[in-house]
UniProtKB/Swiss-Prot annotation:
Organism expressing this protein natively: Limosilactobacillus reuteri (strain DSM 20016) (Lactobacillus reuteri)
The keyword Flavoprotein appears for this protein: no
Enzyme Commission code(s) on record: 5.1.99.6
Cofactor(s) demanded: K(+)
Designated name of the protein: NAD(P)H-hydrate epimerase
Cofactor annotation remark: Binds 1 potassium ion per subunit.
Record's keyword terms, sorted: Isomerase, Metal-binding, NAD, NADP, Nucleotide-binding, Potassium
This protein's encoding gene: nnrE
EC class (word): isomerase
């Protein structure tokens, strides 16, 4: 266990070193991240698993979300993927996870109405990547999430919260729990970020290595 708290740039540096110098593939890190979130959901929120919706952006945080959806599906949970953003801009890892999800025939939609019946929502839109005000479909999705009574589990960071400052970038997901990877993030400990994050769980057994 470590009390280390990092910025977005530090975390990107550690990920880059792990992937490109040590040689651990990014998909391996993504799978470990997904397993950590799955375990937290299954162990902490078993009563909220009737209808789970994973809200996935087009980047690697969304790829984490799709992997989480697959793992929950395999565990017998009824899960739907709500895709937000442009799939043509999806990262390579995201595209790989999408192909696997299609193999398992996990339901997917772009209709925000699916959130209305959700008992648990996984927020996998931005992660540590947000650096500007949230607008458009992402803002609509965040506001729709916040208008539900569902348990909300954020992946790495609540979408819309700045990783370095804890500032809300226009609008942000109000999470019940945030599962953050490898190290705690500065933005989860200060300003609005500490309130929007809910209970913070640091999944530190990620295989990501710090090099300072």
């Amino acid at each position: 266990m470590t009390d280390k708290i990092v910025t977005a740039e530090e975390m990107r540096h550690y990920d880059f070193y792990t992937i490109n110098t040590i040689g651990i593939p990014s998909l391996v890190l993504m799978e470990r991240a997904a397993l950590a979130v799955r375990d937290e959901i299954l162990h902490a929120f078993p009563i909220a698993l009737k209808d789970v919706v994973v809200v996935a952006g087009s980047g690697n945080n969304g790829g984490d979300g799709i992997a989480i959806a697959r793992l929950l599906h395999i565990a017998g949970v009824h899960v739907t993927i709500l895709n937000i953003g442009n799939p043509q801009h999806a990262s390579a890892e995201h595209q790989t996870q999408e192909k696997i999800a299609q193999y398992y025939q996990i339901p997917e939609t772009s209709d925000l109405a699916v959130l209305n019946k959700a008992t648990l929502i996984v927020d996998a839109m931005f992660g540590i990547g947000i650096d500007r005000a949230v607008k458009g479909a992402y803002a609509d999705a965040i506001n729709a999430i916040n208008n539900t009574d569902a348990v909300v589990v954020a992946v790495d960071m609540p979408s819309g919260v700045n990783t370095d400052t804890g500032e809300v970038m226009g609008t942000a997901v109000r999470a019940t729990t945030t599962v953050t990877f490898a190290y705690n993030k500065v933005g989860l400990t200060k300003n609005d970020g500490k309130d929007y994050a809910g209970n913070v769980v640091v999944a530190n057994d990620m295989g990501t290595y710090a090099v300072d």
